[in-house]
A protein has these predicted regions:
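Conserved "HGTGT" condensation-loop signature of ketosynthase/thiolase-family condensing enzymes
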Residues: 1-103
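Single conserved hydrophobic/aromatic residue that forms the stacking wall/gate
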Residues: 101-111
Length: 111
């Protein structure tokens, strides 16, 4: 049996934008997500520029209590996954609940 992969929805949280519309607009208009580091003081390291996610609000996706139990990179993956889910138009039903799965390209490096 051949396994198939189907991409049903898109979501993104990245230095170029925290949603698909913003990210795509910045990409096609040549706006970079690279700038001076602001999340911490980089004076102790040689690199002072990076691609940081900016203006991201996890409370749009989960409660503050849930957010405190997760690392920031989990916030980004969760938000992108939820965006992709909404974009797909899929509905969870009793019949399909065990068949639905979400992933991102970064999860392979985390396991």
């Amino acid at each position: 049996m051949k396994r198939r992969v189907v991409i049903t929805g898109l979501g993104i949280v990245s230095p170029v934008g925290n949603d698909l519309t913003t990210a795509w607009d910045n990409i096609v208009n040549g706006r970079s997500g690279i700038s001076r580091i602001t999340r911490f003081d980089p004076s102790a390291i040689t690199t002072h520029i990076a691609g940081e996610v900016k203006d991201f609000d996890i409370s749009t996706y989960v409660s503050s209590k849930e957010a405190r139990q997760m690392d920031t990179f989990i916030h980004y993956g969760l938000a992108a996954g939820m965006q992709a889910w909404r974009d797909s138009g899929l509905e969870v039903t009793e019949a399909n609940a065990c068949l639905l799965y979400t992933s991102d390209a970064a999860d392979e490096g985390l396991g």
